[in-house]
Amino acid sequence: MAEELIVIAKRDCPTCTMLEDVYATLASGPVPVRIYSQDDPTFPESVSDVIDDTTLEASFRHNIEIVPTLIRLTDGAEMGRTFGWHRGDWESLSGLGELGEDLPESQPGCGAKNVEPGIRERLEVQFGDVGFASRTIELGGYDDPLESCFERGWTDGLPVVPPTDERILRMLKGTSRDPKELVGRIPPNYGECTVEKVAINAVMAGCKPEYMPVVLAALEASLIPEFAMHGLLCTTYFSGPTIIVNGPVTRAIGMNSGVNALGQGNRANSTIGRALQLIIRNVGGGKPNEIDRSTLGNPGKVSFCFAEDESDANWMPLSVARGFEAGTSTVTLFHGDGVQAFCDQKSRTPEELARSMAMALNGVGHPKLAQWSNAILVISPEHYRIFDDAGWGRAEIEEAIHTASVRPGKDLVQGAQGVGEGIDPALVDESLPKFWRDHGLLIVRAGGDAGLFSAIIGGWIGGRNREVVQPVTYAIR
């Protein structure tokens, strides 16, 4: 049987440099030895035939994490390894006695260069079996990657992170799913989207790898037929996908449900929503002035994603209200138009505040339209406190707002009050609530502690087709 020893070390490590005499003893011993240096081919100086591993290929292939590492091979198969310095382990593995008698009995090693941040992914791309399926675009030496992304139409108007192989590989480590798995066909052009393509766009959006499960869930939710993504992309209305995230994942990845929850400044909120929009654009072909014919659009079509505040034990989270068990991480996708301010600094009872909110909600789309579009009501902590102090929870708030939003059809029909817009004249004798009771109004909690201000996010007028256009809630896996 062929026996062999391998040593991998680096000069920039006190433990490695301490073992100069040990390397010389191994090199003169009966078992052949290969000594690799990660950072300096002239080290160790006590050995004449050091192997240059500054490319780190050998370190990568031997999966080195700590240097120095000593490995014993028999017929090319690894029989054992030790790392750092421990005299007994080195003597046992090498078969030599009295190694490093003047040295301490043991000393910890140092981190290997091949596992330094950013290096591992580069080595996997260079020497591993990565095999990306997506087409690679080679840039010239003087090409600016940021400008190249703009020129190829891959951006939403803001700079994107160039999707290098290393960044894509790092992003894929955020999920256990096969990169080649088909997630779905993305409207409007129905391009095939794999997990790998999701990772590419997540890189471009600025996501961290730990956001990948949320991005994947949001994408899968958007492809559920009831969400009607194709229609949403083709409408001339304002709407785009709005993502509400619930459950433990919001805390795990640092999402914002507090101060400025609907605004800028939080990486997870901003980039998860942006990743979905980039996938729609780059894989599905949903680009403005092409299939996207929105008259005005809204700023949320760059990104609109936030977490619900679940810190109050008395409050039923949106995910639970929509049928999921407490503690389940979910995404809810809604056809959102943008934020409409609701200011009420005078109401002091829950009944009064609910009526006030209903008045504001009646303006969604148009004050004379009913059961025409859906909405989200984001209740701020100060407004919620008025409800909570009176013992009101989700059920009581929803019931009071729906009841207060009911209006006589004679005031809403086309032509009433001197305004042509309105509901079907056949409904003149009906009394109609503003929203469908089952999914027309989604109520969530979010926002900073100060301010008697809540928010209304109006919805797509396609919501009038209640059987085929609905918000959807989907579990994150």
Language-model region placement:
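Non-transmembrane, aqueous-exposed alpha-helical and coiled segments at domain scale
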Residues: 124-477
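Short loop/turn motifs at secondary-structure junctions and domain boundaries
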Residues: 61-63
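Non-catalytic, surface beta->alpha helical segment in thiol-disulfide oxidoreductase systems
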Residues: 65-66, 71-107
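Iron-sulfur (Fe-S) cluster-binding modules
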Residues: 100-133, 140
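Structural motif
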Residues: 8-12, 36-39, 380-382, 446
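Thiol-based oxidoreductase modules, predominantly thioredoxin-like and allied folds used
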Residues: 30-55
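Catalytic cores of nucleotide-enabled group-transfer and carboxylate-activating enzymes in metabolic
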Residues: 2-3, 29, 37-39, 70, ...
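Short active-site neighborhood of thiol/selenol oxidoreductases, capturing the structured segment around
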Residues: 1-23, 33-34
